[in-house]
Amino acid sequence: MPTDAITSSHTPTADGALTLPPQATDAGAENTGQPAEVVEHNLTFDGFRYTCRIARRGRLDTQPVVILGGSSQDRNSWQRHEKWLTPLSSVITVDLPGYGTADFLPAKYGVDFLAAAVRHVVRELGIPRINLVAACYGGAIGVRFAQHYPHLLERMMLVGMTTVIPADYAVAMERWDGMIRRGETEPIARELADRFMSPPGTGHVRKKAAVARLVYQQIASQNPEQLRMSAEHNSRLMRHEWYRPEPTPDIPGLVVTGEHDTLTTPAMGRTMAACLPTARFMTIEETDHLAPVERIADFADLVARFCTDRPLENLPYASEPEVFGTSRPA
């Protein structure tokens, strides 16, 4: 698939090839206060324009970290995590077709297409293998990517991922679809914010009020094109398989949920971990479905540890790892 255009902080190379930001020297890597270097590439896959963002600072201690966020996140949603991740490797975030600033994607294109778009990013950047961090809807894309393109994966971390869309959520999606198409942004923003956050009395969640306001404002302030994309996303969810029990590569896997996540519960996370050949399961304490936002530094630390094979035991912010996997001896 052709590259449509390149937007970069560097002058493009003569042949127009896509590149990662250059590797820093050891001395530069030690200066963690140094801002990350950022490059953005505008790409085209199967006729749809989309954008990837690459941030880099420091030595290459592990394979590039590709982050696939939820449907309401975009390539800029993970910038606050980069402080802890860019000293280790490049961090790549993507507005896939149908999301963020990318082209509108009709609902007939499902998870298979989006997984192929992730492969397109990896190939265009010339990366042999990646660490994949995939959250919520990004988790569905990430698992399908692993199933279809296993040779490109080194490790996979799933956040708030399940093998099935919760039944009550599936029913609510049909109602939300109508609300979005009627332009009822404030009611659906309130309902979605309540859905993503754990209900009162579930347990202490850090930054709960602030995160709830953020989610509400983000949804309520969507412009007409963003609302159109949101409606099409709901249609995509209803028309295509969320999870398909296909073979998954035997690579290190980690499944994570918030301790008080009531949307994708810890029990659902354990079921997901049990479907992978080699996986551990953990909860992040005092968080719910939006754990990556509620404990940014701790979540980033967990990603960094997993992607560099450091111990995950005895962490002050998470439960002890539980071992799952289809390749475990009986």
Protein language model regions, located:
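Active-site loop/oxyanion-hole signature of alpha/beta-hydrolase fold enzymes
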Residues: 45-48, 53-55, 92-137, 301
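Catalytic active-site module of serine/aspartate enzymes centered on a nucleophile-bearing elbow/loop
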Residues: 279-330
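Conserved alpha/beta-hydrolase catalytic His-Asp/Glu region
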Residues: 167-169, 186-247
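Short helix immediately C-terminal to the catalytic nucleophile in hydrolase catalytic domains
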Residues: 142-146
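Flexible "cap/lid" loop of the alpha/beta hydrolase fold
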Residues: 147-148, 154-184
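Conserved alpha/beta-hydrolase "nucleophile elbow" surrounding the catalytic nucleophile
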Residues: 71, 134-139, 258
